[in-house]
From Swiss-Prot:
Cofactor(s) it depends on: Zn(2+)
Signal peptide coordinates: none
Stated family: Belongs to the NrdR family.
Residues covered by the ATP-cone domain: 49-139
BP term (GO), one: negative regulation of DNA-templated transcription
Cofactor info, note text: Binds 1 zinc ion.
Cited InterPro entries: ATP-cone_dom, NrdR-like_N, RNR_NrdR-like
Full protein name: Transcriptional repressor NrdR
Zinc finger (unnamed): 3-34
Role this protein plays: Negatively regulates transcription of bacterial ribonucleotide reductase nrd genes and operons by binding to NrdR-boxes.
Pfam families reported in the protein's UniProt record: ATP-cone, Zn_ribbon_NrdR
Amino acid sequence: MRCPFCRHEDTQVVDSRVSEDGAAIRRRRRCSACDKRFTTYERVELNLPAVVKKDGSRTEFDRRKIVASMQLALRKRPVAADAIDAAVARIEYQLLATGEREVRSEKLGELVMNELRGLDTIAYVRFASVYRRFEDVSEFADVIEEFRRASPAKPPRKR
């Protein structure tokens, strides 16, 4: 590795350690020419696919946007931040597993809805109402009826 101080190409690794979060390897290096020390980090580079929007434009995948949209749907719902992070990680894993260079925004929205469905039904309906652009109450009723058919009946809550 090239020295950042004198640009000499011969450096030695003095120490290597796994970072605190386990996501990188930290290496202390020493330049054989100027004897200065510096630190480098080695990380896995994950190439998530570009998102193709409805209008055909392309943008980089942005984890923060997915987290923000899920947080908005889950606002004031009893779901931990760790559960949201895990859901987003599953979405990223699914995208990486496809090996595709691009993903349509519609597909990304479906992945988010699938994760929300498992986390919180209210959040799922909230997200679906915006994502699918519900026009009237009957569309809400259809989604709720879909849930009723899919899940066993629960006893009514006492107030």
